[in-house]
């Protein structure tokens, strides 16, 4: 215990020194992080195109194996969750510590509908989003007058309420045992299974390929990649619409919003509902990927990780969410074999980011709209 105490004090003193170094704005680390942030902020479109192209060819690179693809699918899932929460926290400025509840609602909605009615993934996916949006509105109404710490406490309680309901409502959710036998997604009706019945086609028989378990993994990778890109595209588009500008205005000054005719009630409910919808989509994907869901998959630590991704990436920054997800989830996976050190590595990574970049990796996001003078007239630039 004495050794660990001395080690903790040493690390703490080192971090304090790093913080002092940052305040004095000296040292190569602060310069490097500033240049990287500036490049990503001003060259974001080129960076995004390069990243998407790399993600498309990633499954076919020589070093990509099943483990790397599984980790990539996990990272993409957290990226999608981070983008969904970014609407609520980053754009609208509503601190939500119970976002995992919408993740759980989407997963259980998909699991119950698919196992009860036998509907396909493509039918159940939008329904999972609708149910999650309903719970988002259900949460939004009681917290309309709350902000800051009070809002965080209520949303935290909401997440725990959902988890406890899933544990105790045994007749519907099967309690802590969870739901098994959840159908896997198919490629336009072609299942990814080795043995097929007479007259039935599977993916490998239809395309005359040798059966491989990697086919399903690659399909799941592209599925979550498409869902994440849709989430990003929708967020980028909606933030330029009046409702998106209302979110950002609400984040900065709610009183000023009211004076300008913005309805805070509708604005908050819209943010909660849309953010919850994408959480529900991610939950549906999680359920079909695992083919099993249980309440232990939706604990508070999941909400904490998602919030950490949004905050550490930079409030309102889409690219920052990607970088923070890769960094934080990658750190925890590197220490998977050292279970007792995983959270230490996760916490250390968070501390280091907060020391060098207290406002997030990409804190200086460009405004949604800028006014520039052109031929003696003010014009809008998006």
Name each model-derived stretch.
Residues 1, 91-94, 98-141, 186-206, ...:
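Membrane-embedded helix boundary and interhelical linker motif in transport proteins
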Residues 65-117, 138-155, 247-259, 263-264, ...:
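Single transmembrane alpha-helix segments in multi-pass membrane proteins
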